């Protein structure tokens, strides 16, 4: 500390008890001290820049940076990253991850920079084995949520009024209901244009393996752009991708088969793999029968596909995934309702019945998915 600042601190701390804390002299001293300290800090940053002292890629503070968790960051940011991952906390930024001062203003943006700017990796952090050093509020929330803490966070940098929430917009997914619905509609349109061999017409396990391999690549691409995926960890993203593959291989194929099954019928012969044939017959007797009854159009199929994916996920995954799943279901259902109101002559009761019928179709999907998993294990398809 320089001599001028030291002397000023001594003068302020040595004020007599009789002096008023609001006196002009005291206030001027404090203002002068604040300006002096601010200039000292600015000068320090300038000197560090001139001397080419490296700055932390997360908080931009010139300091000693070292390898941590597969990346490079300062000790403070590395400790923040370790604590966030080990306690399984998921921060959600309310400002679309555009906070300027990531270190102090928003933990969600700070964690984002830990991953993207500093290259820190979740897999390098060990989970806490004992609750000895875990904060009480974390333990309490873990008991209620199954082990994962999801927190929305945005520290105020300036007193700004909260923006008015947009109608039909998900604050968590950061996307409107119409855009979310369009995402799934685009996936179905791609399947129609792809003109891949229909799964219900194949005969051999090799054909199924080829279709699954192609759909895995398409599902990976879809998951990269799927709203809310950036809020999930690596394992959760793998689960979502698995359900996308299932919906692409079996749900979309069954719907396409129902539209043109007279052109897709295969000849009766003995070249079928027996287990595959049994499962395809099961799909035809359940899902295909339902599609033939309800005659879903492409908009309804897109909504049904989304509902299937996230309803399957909802029952066996993390707290964060359940939150994202509910956001997807609410957004898609709202967009489908808006489609009926805008493009059909259905009244509110008819719309409610139709959406209920589409949602109830998911019941048959649970058993199909379970039997598909057994089939894949039997014939050696990675699952």
From Swiss-Prot:
InterPro entries linked to this entry: NHR-like_dom_sf, Nucl_hrmn_rcpt_lig-bd, Znf_hrmn_rcpt, Znf_NHR/GATA
Keywords: DNA-binding, Metal-binding, Nucleus, Receptor, Transcription, Transcription regulation, Zinc, Zinc-finger
GO cellular component, one term: nucleus
PROSITE patterns: NR_LBD (PS51843), NUCLEAR_REC_DBD_1 (PS00031), NUCLEAR_REC_DBD_2 (PS51030)
Source taxon at top rank: Eukaryota
Primary localization class, coarse: nucleus
Purpose of the protein: Orphan nuclear receptor.
Family: Belongs to the nuclear hormone receptor family.
Stored PANTHER family: NR LBD DOMAIN-CONTAINING PROTEIN-RELATED, NUCLEAR HORMONE RECEPTOR FAMILY-RELATED
Protein name: Nuclear hormone receptor family member nhr-217
């Amino acid at each position: 500390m320089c001599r001028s600042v030291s002397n000023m601190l001594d003068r302020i701390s040595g004020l007599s008890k009789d002096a008023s804390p609001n006196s002009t002299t005291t206030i001027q001293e404090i203002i002068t001290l604040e300006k002096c300290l601010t200039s000292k800090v600015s000068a320090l940053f300038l000197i560090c820049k001139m001397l080419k002292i490296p700055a932390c890629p997360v908080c931009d503070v010139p300091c000693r940076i070292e390898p941590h968790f597969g990346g490079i960051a300062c000790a403070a940011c590395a400790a923040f990253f370790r604590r966030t991952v080990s306690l399984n906390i998921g921060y959600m930024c309310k400002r679309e991850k555009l906070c300027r001062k990531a270190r102090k203003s928003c933990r969600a943006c700070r964690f984002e920079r830990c991953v993207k700017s500093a290259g820190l990796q979740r897999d390098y952090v060990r989970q806490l084995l004992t609750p000895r050093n875990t904060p009480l509020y974390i333990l309490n929330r873990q008991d209620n949520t199954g082990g994962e803490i999801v927190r929305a966070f945005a520290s105020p940098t300036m007193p700004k009024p909260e923006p008015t929430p947009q109608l039909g917009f998900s604050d968590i997914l950061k996307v409107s209901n119409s855009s979310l619905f369009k995402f799934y509609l685009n996936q179905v349109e791609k399947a129609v244009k792809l003109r891949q061999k229909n799964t219900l017409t194949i005969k051999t396990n090799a054909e199924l393996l080829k279709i699954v391999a192609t759909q895995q690549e398409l599902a990976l691409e879809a998951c990269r752009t799927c709203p809310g995926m950036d809020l999930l960890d690596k394992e959760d993203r793998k689960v979502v991708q698995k359900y996308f593959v299932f919906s692409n291989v079996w749900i979309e194929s069954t719907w396409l088969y129902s539209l043109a099954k007279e052109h897709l019928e295969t000849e009766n012969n003995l070249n079928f793999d027996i287990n595959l044939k049994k499962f395809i017959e099961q799909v035809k007797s359940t899902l295909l029968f339902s599609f033939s009854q309800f005659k879903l159009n492409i908009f309804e199929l897109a909504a049904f596909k989304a509902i299937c994916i996230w309803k399957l996920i909802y029952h066996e995954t993390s707290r964060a995934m359940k939150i994202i799943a509910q956001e997807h279901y609410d957004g898609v259902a709202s967009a489908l309702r808006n489609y009926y109101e805008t493009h059909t002559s259905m009244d509110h009761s008819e719309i409610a019945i139709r959406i209920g019928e589409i949602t109830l179709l998911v019941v048959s999907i649970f058993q199909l998915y379970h039997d598909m998993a057994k089939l894949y294990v039997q014939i050696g398809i990675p699952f």
